[in-house]
Amino acid sequence: MNPMPSALPSDFLHVDLVTLSPLILLAAAAVVVMLTAAFYRHPRPVMILTLAGLVLSFMALFLSQGTASSQVTTLLILDQYALFFIGLIVVATFVVAILCYRYFGGGESRHEALYILLLLAALGGGVLVASSHFASFLLGLELLSISLFALIAYPRFTEHPLEAGIKYLILAGFSSGLLLFGMALVYAQLGTMQFVKIGTMLAAPGAALELYGLAGLALIVTGVGFKLALVPFHMWTPDVYEGAPVPITAFIATASKGAMLVLLLRYFLMAGAHQSHSITFALSLIAVATILVGNLLALLQNNIKRILAYSSIAQLGYLLVGFLAFDQLAIEAVAYFLTAYFVTMLGAFGVVTVLSEGFNGGSAGEFHDAGEKDSDRLADYAGLFWHRPWLAGVFTAMLLSLAGIPLTMGFIGKFYIVTAGVEASLWMPVITLVIGSIIGLFYYMRIIAVMYGWGPEAAGEAIMLRAASPSFAESATLAALALLLIWLGIFPAQLIGVLEGAGGGLT
């Protein structure tokens, strides 16, 4: 008679639980917030619990570092690479949660469910960046997407968010269908859904994807292209960015897109997809088109949210240039640029959020429930410097970083990306990146000129002057983002050292 299998060692369980603790704490925070909202309907304690859960999850990342490079299950790998980007997503969610409070009416409104959805979306993003299997890929993606549907359409009495939510729902469902079909085709040929096993099988002598396997890989890239808003899958982005509440737009632009890009890089490197010349050539064309289309269409916009939407499309094109190098330098370049992109977009949308609070003289809750528009027209920012100089300064720093001006994180990030592209001989994407950056200067400087170009007497009639003053938490958050942007733009060595360690396990 065979002996019964022994139980798992306690130290094994301890290591796994410690490694998974950032994700476990996010899930636990969502449950606690849900129960609190059910028994005590007031947004302040719910927001405080949300922020506390995010802080605990972030602190748990430091405990997980000692057990990193751990394949805790067949579905998840919590290495330094995953932990770094989970931390980035948690920080982005923390900032968005702070921005949401007054935007949705502060203590006078009932928006407790918003924080539950934010925590679930952050959990979905965390699962995505740690995925090493198609099942966890799909689980994280759907958890993130379903939360975003509700977040985008959250203001109940407004037409624009509902329209944006429906658009996102339809296109996200379509892209998920493409991803599923692509995964099925890859599985049909290789018989496995683990990224590492896919890479091992394709690395064997004489092994290659057959036609339907290549079709499956192409469908996966197409589905991810929709999520990242890469050209020609970008058409939903301006409408959703314009219609969604401003803090939620910030979350989509940062945590949602960042998680998808991080997952795509892991999949390409672990599964050996970067060895397919047809796929890399197609991605090169997509990168070139994304940079040009994003920058050129941004020139035609008079709405701040639409300008930032097209700018985010172009920024993802820049990231693809570094992505295509597929080496250690490329991983560091993508990680640094993505970090700069998070900081910059959170700061830019943070300023728009603050100026949209209490717009038209009412409280934030009255304004947004009344179906009025955000403070997002370019004309609303005329003379901002003369009455809100520090807000104009923060917004200027963010725009200069997006443009890649020296002494900002954006400059270091672009320099890193160009270096990786040149070393990989990606001449056409690199040249396009330089051209796109020059085009981008025009619409970034246009916004800056509007903020500084009007005199005090003309600015006195600007609509944005009736916006509410930012809270201490909002002011501190925006100031921290601006200081971080400049500090890491001048002294990037410490962050680069962290990224070298984080990306080392992927190559």
UniProtKB/Swiss-Prot annotation:
Where does this polypeptide localize? Cell inner membrane
* GO BP annotations, alphabetical order: ATP synthesis coupled electron transport
Q: Where is it chiefly localized? A: membrane
Provide the leader sequence positions: none
Entry keyword Disulfide bond: no
The EC number(s) given in the record are 7.1.1.-
Supply the InterPro entries for this chain. NADH-Q_OxRdtase_suN/2, ND/Mrp_TM
Q: Name one GO molecular function term.
A: quinone binding
Q: Among the entry's GO cellular component annotations, what is one?
A: plasma membrane
> Could you give the subunit structure recorded for this chain?
NDH-1 is composed of 14 different subunits. Subunits NuoA, H, J, K, L, M, N constitute the membrane sector of the complex.
Q: Which family does it belong to?
A: Belongs to the complex I subunit 2 family.
Its protein name is: NADH-quinone oxidoreductase subunit N
Q: Which organism is it from?
A: Nitrosospira multiformis (strain ATCC 25196 / NCIMB 11849 / C 71)
Supply the gene name. Answer: nuoN
